[in-house]
Amino acid sequence: MKQSIITSFLVFAFAAILMAQAPTAKIKTEPVSSETLTKLGLTTNSVSAGLPVFANQTYVYLSANDVGGYLPVLTSSFNLFQKPGGSAATLEDIGVANWTGLKADVKGAYKVELTMTTANGTDQDTITLYAGDYVGVGNFDGVSAAFPSCMSCHTGQPAFDNIYSSWQNTGHANTLKKAMDTWSFFSTSCLKCHSTGTDYDLVAANNGFDDVAAALGWVWVGPPAPGKWDAFKTAYPTAVKFATIGCENCHGAGSNHTSFQQTGSEFKTMATFEAGVCNQCHAESQGVQYESSL
């Protein structure tokens, strides 16, 4: 009986503290996979890693959250109060409660403010988002890195060299190379997961593999056969830095990395171990092993 009274008291005390806690607004960048697009009924056709660094002409998804009182959000209002010169981008109602979507149309920084209300009051938060073009990993399979590719600067830095050395032996680095030479079937539809920056469903010009390859005149002619990767590499060396699942697939499009750093901005490339980054590709039906690991 005594234990029950103490337990009840603690529950009521905790509830009282929770109800008295002022809200703390937080804008979260939401990861969205192809499966999530279908589940939520989104018509944007744009997957997202859930990072504030994202590719130009694609979407970033934002949600309103209370990380102070952890109470349900009653109302939320997002305001895009700063964007790059020449941008006509607007925040979009995507049909999900307390979410908004932003499709970048110009490279640069976008600043969004949230005003959020819970039963305990109102609070605000801001976030800076960076839309950029892809630059490619560089220094892959004997093709030297040229600025502004990632390894044109990071080669020779022990921490990065160690990461790169491990990465270049993985499937993420070598899948497209192997696909051209040895797969029983390969088509350009495979590129959206097995290269850097190829349009997933939403058409976007952001210097991804598909954009670079098209500009160079590369056209895949199947079927796969030994030597096709080497022929591609020899004829189109500037496309090789995009022909992997490289740095930017997980860190976000990197063209702003050097320009914003040089101006003293708070911008840095982003990294997260959250599943949303992997889900850009692995949430599809062929990712059964990955799904089972969650």
Language model segments and positions:
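Positively charged n-region of N-terminal signal peptides that target proteins for export
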Residues: 1-6
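Sequence context of c-type cytochrome heme-c attachment sites
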Residues: 26-65, 79-274, 280-294
